[in-house]
Amino acid sequence: MTNQDLQGRTIQARNPRTGEMDYSFEVTKNSEIEEIVSDLRSSQKAWSEKTIDQRAETLNDWAKAVSSNEALLEALVQDTGRYFIATAEIARLTTMIGDWLTIGHEIFKDQPGIQSSAPTVTYQHQYKPFEVVGIIGPWNFPFLITLIDLIPALMAGSAVVVKPSEITPRFIQPLQETLKQVPELNGVCRFIQGDGETGQALINNVDALCFTGSVKTGKLVYKSGAENFIPIYAELGGKDPVIITENADPKESAKIVLRASVQATGQACQSIERVYVHESIADNFKTELVQLAKAVTLNYPNIREGHIGPLIFDKQADIIESHINDAKEKGAEILSGGSIENHGGGKWVLPTVIGNVDHSMLVMMEETFGPVIPVMTYSDINEAIRLANDTKYGLSAAVLAGDSQEAESVAKHIDAGAVSIQDCGITTYVFDGEKNWFKESGIGASRMGEMGMLRFFRKKVLYTQSASENYGIDAMGER
């Protein structure tokens, strides 16, 4: 028994709008995690034997409980300092269940035997779900990103344990109450609370794990997964570029880039964090972008007004500030915003457009995770592609051009798992296409498309011999 089990631990959480440590929770003990996983294993077999339509029906019952729980919405609002995005996170549950049900029907449909290379042998595949899947969620979209892994895992027939981020823990308690309203689901889905130590205990007990977070922590998670000999599906950081060609409309491009850079205060891994614009339209583009950036307002003091919320994690404010200061010290020009603002105890930053940047600056090389938009000009499209690929990240990217054909000709050369053409950040709302994570932006099977569910199965093959006479021992030997 560990010291944690004997004494227990309590963690405090900061309110992003007030800056106050106004919430605390007791960490789930390691022994409790072992008990939870054991209970889930006992319930998983019956869950996996249900049809996918039956599992979807149970999940839809949960969605109704979630949508009617005002305490859950209020807790998520307090966790993130955002009202409209919190509302959207909760609303996404119902549509996500429907989306995965459609995909699941294709996976689970009856398949006839397939002729093998041997004339008398056919085969068919069987999908066996992992018994217990673990999920370690992030703080930027604490409910939504958890759902992206949780729903397909449950639909596949796995039981699931979720550890949300300790930065945004308030929503866990009311969410657990909604699970209790659907006992069948509560038997195969549980939430635990804690920090990195808790995450390690989770990895030690599950059969597969999904992680969303930083590259640094992701590497530790992957190492631990290897030691436990379980698959890890990790989506890590990003430094997404957009290339704007000379034939693009500078005004429309500015609108797209601003939205993709500052939505959710830039606290999204697929936010645009680097802009490469052709020199012939750069001035017009920057003029439009700055004008739009200066029109963005904070949702303070009224959370239901304004465009962007506070910085959820106070340490992220320090990173953003260091990136801006580093750029200024190296000769960059701040065209809008440029500082961390304190309002009511919370930390906020208005859209910060930065010109005269290069790849010696942190703001062009490291993940900023805030509404900071560094703009770099180029003269040759091959130079733009080289710059876009000059990064340790490869999550996603975008190309804005005169038409989609021109954009596609550029996109195929970008080293990233998903490239939006004639838009930015399409993967924030479209999950149909499969993508992998390039470079240090992640590892493991895609969380999108059919593979988003298939990754929770082990594939089994059944071979059937149809020959009337099978080979006996007389067929052996060296004759």
Roles of regions detected by a PLM:
Residues 159-161, 334, 418:
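A short hydrophobic/small-residue beta-strand
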Residues 18-24, 341, 348-479:
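Conserved C-terminal structural/oligomerization subdomain of aldehyde/semialdehyde dehydrogenase
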Residues 1-121:
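N-terminal Rossmann-like NAD(P)+-binding subdomain of aldehyde/semialdehyde dehydrogenases
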Residues 44, 48, 63-73, 80, ...:
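Structural signal for hydrophobic packing residues in well-ordered secondary-structure cores
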Residues 19, 55, 157, 189, ...:
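Residue-level signal for inorganic ion chemistry
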Residues 112-252, 378:
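Rossmann-like NAD(P) dinucleotide-binding subdomain of oxidoreductase/dehydrogenase enzymes
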